[in-house]
Amino acid sequence: MSIALLAAAAVIIICVLINRVSNKIGVPVLIAFIGLGMLFGSDGILKIPFENYDFAEQICTIALIFIMFYGGFGTRWSEAKPVAAKSIVMSTVGVAATAGLTGLFCHFILKFPLWESMLTGSVISSTDAASVFSILRSKKLGLKENTASLLEMESGSNDPCSYMLTAIILSIMGGKISGGAIVYLIFAQFAYGLIFGFVIAIGAKLVLQHFKFSTEGFDAAFVLAVAVLAYALPSAIGGNGYLSTYIVGIILGNSDIKNKKSMVHFFDGLTGLMQMLIFFLLGLLSFPSALPKVFPTALAISLFLMLIARPIVTFGILTPMKCSIRQSLLVSWSGLRGAASIVFAIMATVTAENLKNDIFHIVFCIVLISISLQGTLIPFMAKVFGMVDNNSNVLKTFNDYVEELDVQFIKLTVQGEHPWKDKRIRELSIPWDLLFVLIIRGDQSIIPNGKTKIKDGDIVVVSAPEYHGTGDIQFTEYKISSGNKWIGQKISDFAKVSSNLVILIKRGQEVVIPRGPTDIEENDVLVLHVPEKIDITKIKKD
C-alpha cells in the first residue's frame, strides 16, 4: 500500500512539474503525461504490468464526469450565448457527421469491417474541451468573432453525442438491439439526460443559494457530489449521464452562488488531475512496441480527420450560419481529440468482441498526433488565418474572470468628534470623485443618498478612483519587538524623526489607522510609506 501511494504521489508531482515546463516550451503537457505512463508501463523502464481494461474504464469514466462538468461550469454563458446555436449544431450534427465520414473512410479505404469502422468513427468523433481550455488560457489567446466561446462550448458539449453513438454501435455489434430499440435509446439518452440535468441543477442551485454550510469549503464538496449525482441518476435508467453532467455544470456555473470563483479554480485543478490520470493510464495501458504496426493506419485517419472530415463538417454547418471563411478554417483546425476519445476507446475494447483491429492503440496514436500537431499549432494557425484579437481578453469567456475596475473602496468609522457625525451626505464638503456607496449601522446595511444622515458608530464605505503609480509608492513593515525604544511613544514622536508616513498599524487581528496621539505598543507592525528603500532601524529618537 505504501509503495503504491509513493508511486502515485511521485507521478502527480512529476506531472505538475512537467506542466510548468510544458507551458514554457509550448509543447502540450498531455503528451508528457502519456509519455510518463509509457515509461511506467510494461514496455517502459519500470515495467509495471497493467492490462486491466475494465478497471481503467471505470476510473476513466469517473474522471470524465468531472471533465464534462467543468466544461459547463467554467463556461460563461453571457459570452457563449451569441454562438450557442452554432456550438450545439456542431456538437450534435457535427459529431454524427464526423463519425459517419470517418467510418466510411475506414471501411472503404482502410478496409475495416463496416460496424468496426463506424465504431472507430464514433469513438473519435468528439473534440477535447480540457485541451482547448488549456491552450486558450495558457496562451491568453483572444480570438475574433467570438470564436473562443464557440470552441469552448462545442468541445465542452460534444462528448455526450459521441458516447451515445459509441453505445449504439457497440449494441449493434453485440446483436442486442433492434431498430425500435435504437430509436428508444436515442430518445432516452437525450430526454433523460436533459430532464435530470435541469432538475438536478435547479435543486442544487436552490441549496447553494439558501443553505448555509457550517464549514468553509463544504459548498465545493456539495457541488462535487452533485456532479457525480448528475451522471449516476440518468445513467441508471438509460439516460446520458455526460449530457446531464454538462447541463448541471453550465447552469450552476452561470448562477448567482457564493464562492463561485473559488469553486471554478477547485474544479480547474480537479480537471487537471483527472487529465493526468486518464493520459497516464493511457500510457500505462499501451504497448509502445505495438505502435509501429498501427501508426500508418492512425496517421491516415488523423490526416483524414484534420484535412477532410472536420473541414467538410465545419464548413457545411457554419457557412449557412453566416460564419466567415477564416473562422471556419480555425474551427476546423481546432478539433483536438483527447480524453473522451480515450475513455470511449477503452470502453470499446472492453465491450466489443472479436475486433479485427487494435482500436485502442489506433486511438492512442490519433490522440498523440492530434495534440502534438494540432494543439501546438493552434496559436500559429490563429495568426495565419488572421483570427487573433489582441484587444479581447479570452479569460472573459471563463466563469472565474472578474472584471477589473479602476476603483478602490475605503472603510471609515464615524465616532467621537468626527466631522461627519449627525450630518447629511449632501451637507458634506467632499471631492467630486468620492462616492458614498454603503453605510453599515449595526446589523443594517444602508444604500445612501444625499438625504442620508450619518450617525455616531456608522461604518461608511466610500469609493474613489484607483491610483496607477509605477513604483513611486513603496511600503515596508517595521515590527515593534520586545524592548524596542518606540514602545509607549506616540506616532507624532515617530513622525518628528522620520520622513516616512505610518499609514496603518497591524495590532493582532486589528488594523489601526494612526493619528498623532496614537500610542505605539509592543508587537505592533507599522506599515510605512517610504519614498525610497531605507534602513528603518537607523531612525533615532531625540
List where the protein language model places each region.
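Cytosolic regulatory regions of ion transport systems
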Residues: 312, 319-330, 340-542
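Transmembrane helical cores of multi-pass secondary ion antiporters/exchangers
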Residues: 1-391, 404
